């Protein structure tokens, strides 16, 4: 676990953070440009020193200003992947991967090369690589130092969309395979939804919220990053079973299930989905003889009337789902808080 309790004055920005980052998985630092995201991971890495406070990693103190303790960056056992790959142009890919490592664990080397899909690049030089390939090599180099945590500072920001999505797939696999935490800086909603398990929401140097992604998505502080004309819910649910005949997969709620297109994943593995309010309609009675496969019962939790629509939050097995309806429909159904309803979900997006 990474424990952070620091203060740092950076020009006009007063950075303050008190966090306990989980021991594995991806924790995203999210916020506007200039909110302190990169500065915070630079404090963790040792590239910047705090004015006050301490940082510890797996109970090992990295810095404690009250005791004048400050471990140098190169002794912190931290891997850092920057926005640009920062490869040595005169070394091959293999040379870059092995740079600065006294003794290479060949089995680990092969595993990382295979995981990142860079085996065919080992004899090539950085000038011949695409942006995505360079970043995969940079990630491999960081992992081969056997770090206790991996810091990633917007590693996809310099890539075009196809390369970005290609590398994101590798990062998804990487986050599930390696047994260390990843602290990931981004201001991209797509990256957040695809990669993050936990989110630190930063604004003007302050931690405004820290929670699982699904909870942050519902947090009012996150509203500036969501589409104004649409509500949505993000859920992470386990696979119950796969129906090979119909090519669909069932995800489990407490007492109900949600059907999605077939997934190449094991039973019990969590799948993250997004349900848009515009894809959900409501009924006071259970619909019959309908083509809609996902019909779930729940209770009205919130009613938010807007200028040209009404957003109704339904609690289904303790999970929030939004339905966007008209004011006419609200009056016709006479919806009240706590009222039982059936939610008809027309579409589910897998993230």
From Swiss-Prot:
<keyword id="KW-0472">Membrane</keyword>
<keyword id="KW-0997">Cell inner membrane</keyword>
<dbReference type="InterPro" id="IPR011868">
    <property type="entry name" value="ModC_ABC_ATP-bd"/>
</dbReference>
<keyword id="KW-0547">Nucleotide-binding</keyword>
<dbReference type="Pfam" id="PF03459">
    <property type="entry name" value="TOBE"/>
</dbReference>
<dbReference type="InterPro" id="IPR005116">
    <property type="entry name" value="Transp-assoc_OB_typ1"/>
</dbReference>
<dbReference type="GO" id="GO:0005886">
    <property type="term" value="C:plasma membrane"/>
</dbReference>
<feature type="domain" description="ABC transporter">
    <location>
        <begin position="1"/>
        <end position="229"/>
    </location>
</feature>
<feature type="binding site">
    <location>
        <begin position="31"/>
        <end position="38"/>
    </location>
    <ligand>
        <name>ATP</name>
    </ligand>
</feature>
<feature type="domain" description="Mop">
    <location>
        <begin position="289"/>
        <end position="351"/>
    </location>
</feature>
<keyword id="KW-1278">Translocase</keyword>
<comment type="similarity">
    <text>Belongs to the ABC transporter superfamily. Molybdate importer (TC 3.A.1.8) family.</text>
</comment>
<keyword id="KW-0813">Transport</keyword>
<dbReference type="GO" id="GO:0005524">
    <property type="term" value="F:ATP binding"/>
</dbReference>
<comment type="subunit">
    <text>The complex is composed of two ATP-binding proteins (ModC), two transmembrane proteins (ModB) and a solute-binding protein (ModA).</text>
</comment>
<keyword id="KW-0067">ATP-binding</keyword>
<dbReference type="InterPro" id="IPR008995">
    <property type="entry name" value="Mo/tungstate-bd_C_term_dom"/>
</dbReference>
<keyword id="KW-1003">Cell membrane</keyword>
<dbReference type="GO" id="GO:0016887">
    <property type="term" value="F:ATP hydrolysis activity"/>
</dbReference>
<comment type="function">
    <text>Part of the ABC transporter complex ModABC involved in molybdenum import. Responsible for energy coupling to the transport system.</text>
</comment>
<dbReference type="InterPro" id="IPR003593">
    <property type="entry name" value="AAA+_ATPase"/>
</dbReference>
<dbReference type="InterPro" id="IPR004606">
    <property type="entry name" value="Mop_domain"/>
</dbReference>
<dbReference type="InterPro" id="IPR027417">
    <property type="entry name" value="P-loop_NTPase"/>
</dbReference>
<dbReference type="InterPro" id="IPR003439">
    <property type="entry name" value="ABC_transporter-like_ATP-bd"/>
</dbReference>
<dbReference type="InterPro" id="IPR017871">
    <property type="entry name" value="ABC_transporter-like_CS"/>
</dbReference>
<dbReference type="GO" id="GO:0015412">
    <property type="term" value="F:ABC-type molybdate transporter activity"/>
</dbReference>
<dbReference type="Pfam" id="PF00005">
    <property type="entry name" value="ABC_tran"/>
</dbReference>
<keyword id="KW-0500">Molybdenum</keyword>
<dbReference type="InterPro" id="IPR050334">
    <property type="entry name" value="Molybdenum_import_ModC"/>
</dbReference>
<protein>
    <recommendedName>
        <fullName>Molybdenum import ATP-binding protein ModC</fullName>
        <ecNumber>7.3.2.5</ecNumber>
    </recommendedName>
</protein>
């Amino acid at each position: 676990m990474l424990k952070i309790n620091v203060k740092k004055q950076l020009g006009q920005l007063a950075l303050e953070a008190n966090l306990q980052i989980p021991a594995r998985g991806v924790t995203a630092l999210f916020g506007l440009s200039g909110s302190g995201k990169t500065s915070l991971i630079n404090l963790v890495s040792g590239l910047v020193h705090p004015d006050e406070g301490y940082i510890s990693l797996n109970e090992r103190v990295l810095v404690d200003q009250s005791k004048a303790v400050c471990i140098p960056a190169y002794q912190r056992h931290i891997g850092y992947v920057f926005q640009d790959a920062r490869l040595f142009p005169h070394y091959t890919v293999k040379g870059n991967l092995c740079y600065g490592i006294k003794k290479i664990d060949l089995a680990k080397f092969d595993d990382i090369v295979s995981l990142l899909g860079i085996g065919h690049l080992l004899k090539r030089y950085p000038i011949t690589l695409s942006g995505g390939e360079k970043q995969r090599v940079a990630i491999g180099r960081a992992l081969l130092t056997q770090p206790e945590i991996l810091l990633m500072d917007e590693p996809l920001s310099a890539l075009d969309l196809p390369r970005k999505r290609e590398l994101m797939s590798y990062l998804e696999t990487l986050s599930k395979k390696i047994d260390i935490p990843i602290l990931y800086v981004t201001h991209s909603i797509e990256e957040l939804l695809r990669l993050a398990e936990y989110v630190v929401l930063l604004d003007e140097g302050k931690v405004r919220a820290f929670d699982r992604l699904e909870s942050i998505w519902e947090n009012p502080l996150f509203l500036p990053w969501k589409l104004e004309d649409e509500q949505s819910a993000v859920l992470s649910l386990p696979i119950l079973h796969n129906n090979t005949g119909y090519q669909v997969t069932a995800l489990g709620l407490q007492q109900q299930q949600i059907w999605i297109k077939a997934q190449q994943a094991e039973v019990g593995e969590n799948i993250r989905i997004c349900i848009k309010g515009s894809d959900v309609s409501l009924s006071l009675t259970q619909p019959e003889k309908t083509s809609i496969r996902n019909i779930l019962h729940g209770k009205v939790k919130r009613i938010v009337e807007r200028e040209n629509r009404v957003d109704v939050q339904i609690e289904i097995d303790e999970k929030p789902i939004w339905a966007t309806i008209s004011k006419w429909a609200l009056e016709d159904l006479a919806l009240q808080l706590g009222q039982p309803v059936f939610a008809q979900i027309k579409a589910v997006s897998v993230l």
